[in-house]
């Protein structure tokens, strides 16, 4: 017997709700504001079938290009063969959430602006580039009252 290749085939676990997260959708989902240019993550909500994306787009990140009263238009770059195609999806707000991929960058921009303003007030140059973790500083261990000890492994014995 042939295998079925329906629109939602092989999504038994992909679209199921999380453990103890069943039931009605929280109102905060509908109160989030999406603007054109926002970066969003696609995560389908299995309890809302309307405006649900195809299984391929689960977990993908895209950019909002259109906003209507109940749905959001998202642009996704899909790899087809050896090229990327721009796909435009119209999804309901239950199936998307704001991406945290730029969160660290935006926090760093604010921190750098504060550092720059403080340095300008003091009239000093400031280093804003991130530095990799440096080696630890050297240490000196005193042997005064702390005689080095030689350690040796204890021989393994079996008692039967």
Curated annotation (Swiss-Prot):
Places the protein is found: Cytoplasm
Coiled coil: none
GO cellular component, one term: cytosolic large ribosomal subunit
First-listed, main subcellular location of the protein, grouped into a coarse class: cytoplasm
Single biological process term from Gene Ontology: cytoplasmic translation
Pfam families in alphabetical order: Ribosomal_L21e
One Gene Ontology term of the molecular function aspect: structural constituent of ribosome
UniProt key word Ubl conjugation: yes
Keyword annotations: Cytoplasm, Isopeptide bond, Ribonucleoprotein, Ribosomal protein, Ubl conjugation
Cross-link Glycyl lysine isopeptide (Lys-Gly) (interchain with G-Cter in ubiquitin), sequence positions: 32
Tagged with keyword Disulfide bond: no
Protein family: Belongs to the eukaryotic ribosomal protein eL21 family.
Assembly, per entry: Component of the large ribosomal subunit (LSU). Mature yeast ribosomes consist of a small (40S) and a large (60S) subunit. The 40S small subunit contains 1 molecule of ribosomal RNA (18S rRNA) and 33 different proteins (encoded by 57 genes). The large 60S subunit contains 3 rRNA molecules (25S, 5.8S and 5S rRNA) and 46 different proteins (encoded by 81 genes).
Miscellaneous notes: There are 2 genes for eL21 in yeast.
Role: Component of the ribosome, a large ribonucleoprotein complex responsible for the synthesis of proteins in the cell. The small ribosomal subunit (SSU) binds messenger RNAs (mRNAs) and translates the encoded message by selecting cognate aminoacyl-transfer RNA (tRNA) molecules. The large subunit (LSU) contains the ribosomal catalytic site termed the peptidyl transferase center (PTC), which catalyzes the formation of peptide bonds, thereby polymerizing the amino acids delivered by tRNAs into a polypeptide chain.
The protein's name: Large ribosomal subunit protein eL21A
Native organism: Saccharomyces cerevisiae (strain ATCC 204508 / S288c) (Baker's yeast)
């Amino acid at each position: 017997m042939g295998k079925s290749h329906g629109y939602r085939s092989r999504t038994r676990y992909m679209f199921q709700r999380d453990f103890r997260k069943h039931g009605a959708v929280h109102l905060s989902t509908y109160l989030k504001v999406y603007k054109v240019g926002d970066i969003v993550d696609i995560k389908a909500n299995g309890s809302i079938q309307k405006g649900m994306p195809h299984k391929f787009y689960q977990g993908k990140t895209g950019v909002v290009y259109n906003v209507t009263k109940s749905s959001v238009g998202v642009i996704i770059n899909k790899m087809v063969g050896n090229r990327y195609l721009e796909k435009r999806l119209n999804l309901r707000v239950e199936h998307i959430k704001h991406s945290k991929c730029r969160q660290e960058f935006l926090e760093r921009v604010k921190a750098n602006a504060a550092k720059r303003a403080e340095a300008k007030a003091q009239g000093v140059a400031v280093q804003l580039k991130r530095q990799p973790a440096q080696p630890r500083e050297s240490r000196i261990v005193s042997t005064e009252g702390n005689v080095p000890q030689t350690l040796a492994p204890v021989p393994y014995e079996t008692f039967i």
